[in-house]
Amino acid sequence: MSTTEPAAPVAPLDITATEEWAALTTHLREISEVSLRDLFAADPRRGETFAAEADGLYLDYSKNRLTARTVELLTALARRAGLADRIEAMFRGERINVTENRPVLHVALRAPAGTRIEVDGVDVVPDVHRVLDAMSQFADRVRSGDWLGATGERIRTVVNIGIGGSDLGPAMAYDALRDYADRSIEVRFVSNVDPTDIWEATADLDPASTLFIVSSKTFTTLETISNARAARSWLTGLLGEDAVSRHFVAVSTNAEKVAEFGIDTVNMFEFWDWVGGRYSVDCAIGLSLMIAIGPPNFREFLAGFAAMDTHFRTAPFERNLPVLLGLIGLWYRDFFGTATHAVLPYSHYLGRFPAYLQQLDMESNGKSVDLTGRPVSTPTGPIVWGTPGTNGQHAYYQLLHQGTTIVPADFIGFVRPNHPGVGTADGAGVDQHALLLANFLAQTEALAFGRTAAEVAAEGVTPDLVAHRTFPGNRPSNTLLAQKLTPFALGQLIALYEHKVFTQGVIWGINSFDQWGVELGKVLAGRIIPELGSEQEPELGHDSSTNALIKRLRAG
């Protein structure tokens, strides 16, 4: 049960000073010269042994530079860090976000009805389902044509206005689940304060058939409210002030500000301060997604999250997908010294998934002090990046295979396609999805095992080209495989990475649920805005570079 008092920071444990860390350091020296070729040659069943599964989501982590002893030592490190207790603390609604004195309960957003999760002694799950029901009713009205615009037109376009978690999550999920969307309603997303964004989003729209969803917890976020005002001006300039109530709804906690804007608070869908922005796609922030794919599919999406939540909470660490991914990532970040992590989905629909994970991971674990404010003693969150396969193969895979930087990677694939493809890929009866999967598998194999100089020479390559066509291999990767990209599978994947990030944050002893690093830029921007716009020459008090740039911008 949560209390109003902040949870005491988990023991300010210097994880690098533990016996478990020392054992891993010693083990690294033992394994550093062992290649993946050696490991697979020594164990013909390695590909089956180093694998785990949860509700149809399969993880093959055999192509990593680790052994059973590595997994044993890493899981011991997780236990030493108190991971099991921290998992329970989160699910119990304790205020584990200690810098903001808040519970962290995105898991409540997808908890089945009847589950009990308390904040300050109050079960929050009924409230979650009340909002879900309200969202469902509204989404059904829009989809059926019962909700009409001010002139009696059906809604044909929904424009979601938000930024950060209010944009990245729903935009990613909308793209991912387009195969399940009602194609008679288009959803667009506006986030950038650059006026080009809102201009392009509305340039070809009919205001009479456009619905805006303004998503902002406080309804004061600079970029979001600026874009919302621009959208309001565009709409009222064509339809009049009275049209606002039929063409704007809000996702917020600030009813007063919503009403001031002109949105009827009956059409405000709430969420709670125990929901972080980057963990909010499965609450009212996902209203645009629910309108697109329909309430039943949205609830399947939530069911995927919930299944992974249960797995994370109950599975032994040795078979726990989020824990394994977190520990493997930490193994490379802290012991091998890798700085980046690639996420490579072999699905065109998951084009925005790496960008979504950038916020989830880098905003959560991009921290340099621990829970007590002391400098951390080891590197924390990696740089996360990636694009869909096979496009990336023709861009940066060259560096992955033959560059001097080791980049651990997650490959994500699906057994069955959402679309079968037209004709065959090569004229020999191989369809496009099989071609995609062949590349998906080939890349992990090539990264792991490479090609030796002797193998290249044996193919008849001229001696002057042998070095250029040799692949060092020993490049690590995980393979994630689901049957098909469905709402359930997407929910699983998102929750998998949420809990991976949490696992790493616990071991590093940092707060994965605040984001103070975004604040300073906002404060300084607040100073600069009037300096750029004032009629009188302002007295500038910045550094010489910023002062000179402001003067150049003012000069036009």
UniProtKB/Swiss-Prot annotation:
Q: Name one GO molecular function term.
A: monosaccharide binding
Annotated pathway: Carbohydrate biosynthesis; gluconeogenesis; Carbohydrate degradation; glycolysis; D-glyceraldehyde 3-phosphate and glycerone phosphate from D-glucose: step 2/4
Q: Which reaction does it catalyse?
A: alpha-D-glucose 6-phosphate = beta-D-fructose 6-phosphate
Q: Which GO terms describe its biological process?
A: gluconeogenesis; glucose 6-phosphate metabolic process; glycolytic process
Major place of residence: cytoplasm
Q: Which UniProt keywords apply?
A: Cytoplasm, Gluconeogenesis, Glycolysis, Isomerase
- Its EC number is 5.3.1.9
Please tell me which top-level EC class this enzyme sits in.
isomerase
Q: Does the keyword Protein biosynthesis apply?
A: no
Which CDD domains has this protein been placed in?
Answer: SIS_PGI_1, SIS_PGI_2
Any idea what this protein is called?
Glucose-6-phosphate isomerase
Q: Which gene encodes it?
A: pgi
